């Protein structure tokens, strides 16, 4: 298990923290090779891996399955795992069972929970039970129906003040980090100024401790239109489609496989296959 200490030292030294989502073994290996500071096994896997319209259908089983693969691919990187929709609502006993399963079976270093209010009490109790937690405020995708779509949060004074209050309460509840999603840059900056824990932004501007983006978004891999806050660093949609098309063409026209891609046999054995006669 990894601790927050190296990450906090980087924050204190003024070094930005870099978080990236990962959902399987190869994405985790690439992320660790690229020297990201943290990995997030997000319930966004429901969208980008499983093809769901939202994260609502993602289960604890899904999170455990994918997080175990990520841990195998990136054993040296701090890994945060989302608690999926409805797994931390209702009785605390049920929440504890789900959290403990994810934590134990996946090798998670921290669990991420969306929302404020009663969720902060859950964060406090899980922390007391020995499971570090990350809070997630602003746009919370599991509650997007209540929030009336994917919209910037905290745009009014009242909403901004509530977000600040919730952020302070999250730190007081024991959250080790705070993810702020889709909030105005100046508001995110003010939140980071008021907190001692790292604020990791996604669509929250540059004046926070670090940034998180989705693996498939920065690589333009299997995704469509990108959100405003995403910067693409590759175009795997185009390069991947072109590569597959070339493979199809080579097989169809007989140029693949070539002799270099094939395994040979001794001529006598070949003759034996043809009853001793090779035409």
Swiss-Prot record:
GO CC field: cytoplasm
Free-text cofactor note: Binds 1 Mg(2+) ion per subunit.
Superkingdom to which the source organism belongs: Bacteria
Gene Ontology MF term list: 3-methyl-2-oxobutanoate hydroxymethyltransferase activity; magnesium ion binding
Cofactor entry: Mg(2+)
InterPro entries: Pantoate_hydroxy_MeTrfase, Pyrv/PenolPyrv_kinase-like_dom, Pyrv_kinase-like_dom_sf
Chain sites annotated for binding Mg(2+): 43, 82, 114
Alphabetized UniProt keyword annotations: Cytoplasm, Magnesium, Metal-binding, Pantothenate biosynthesis, Transferase
EC number: 2.1.2.11
A Pfam short name: Pantoate_transf
GO biological process: pantothenate biosynthetic process
UniProt pathway: Cofactor biosynthesis; (R)-pantothenate biosynthesis; (R)-pantoate from 3-methyl-2-oxobutanoate: step 1/2
Similarity comment: Belongs to the PanB family.
Subunit structure of this chain's protein: Homodecamer; pentamer of dimers.
Name of the protein described by the UniProt record: 3-methyl-2-oxobutanoate hydroxymethyltransferase
Native organism: Exiguobacterium sibiricum (strain DSM 17290 / CCUG 55495 / CIP 109462 / JCM 13490 / 255-15)
Gene label: panB
């Amino acid at each position: 298990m990894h601790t927050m200490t190296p990450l906090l030292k980087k924050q204190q030294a003024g070094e930005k923290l870099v978080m990236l989502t990962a959902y399987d073994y190869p994405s985790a290996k690439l992320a660790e090779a690229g020297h990201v500071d943290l990995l997030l096994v997000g319930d966004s896997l429901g969208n980008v891996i499983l093809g769901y319209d939202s994260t609502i259908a993602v289960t604890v089983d899904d999170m455990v399955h994918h997080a175990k693969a990520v841990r195998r691919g990136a054993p040296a990187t701090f890994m945060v795992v989302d608690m999926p929709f409805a797994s931390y609502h209702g009785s605390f006993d049920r929440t504890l069972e789900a959290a403990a399963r994810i934590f134990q079976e996946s090798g998670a270093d921290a669990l991420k929970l969306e929302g404020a209010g009663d969720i902060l009490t859950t964060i406090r109790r899980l922390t007391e039970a020995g499971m570090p937690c990350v809070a997630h405020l602003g746009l919370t995708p599991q509650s997007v129906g209540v929030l009336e779509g994917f919209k910037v949060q905290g745009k009014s004074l009242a909403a901004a003040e509530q977000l600040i209050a919730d952020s302070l309460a999250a730190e007081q509840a024991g959250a080790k980090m705070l993810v702020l999603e889709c909030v105005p840059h100046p508001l995110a900056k003010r939140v980071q100024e008021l907190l001692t824990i790292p604020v990791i932004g996604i669509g929250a501007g540059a004046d926070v401790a670090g940034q998180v983006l989705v693996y498939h978004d920065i690589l333009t891999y299997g995704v469509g239109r990108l959100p405003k806050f995403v910067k693409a660093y590759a175009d795997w949609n185009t390069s991947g489609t072109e590569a597959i098309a070339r493979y199809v063409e080579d097989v169809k026209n007989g140029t693949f496989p070539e002799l270099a891609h094939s395994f040979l046999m001794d001529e006598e054995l070949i003759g034996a296959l043809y009853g001793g006669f090779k035409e």
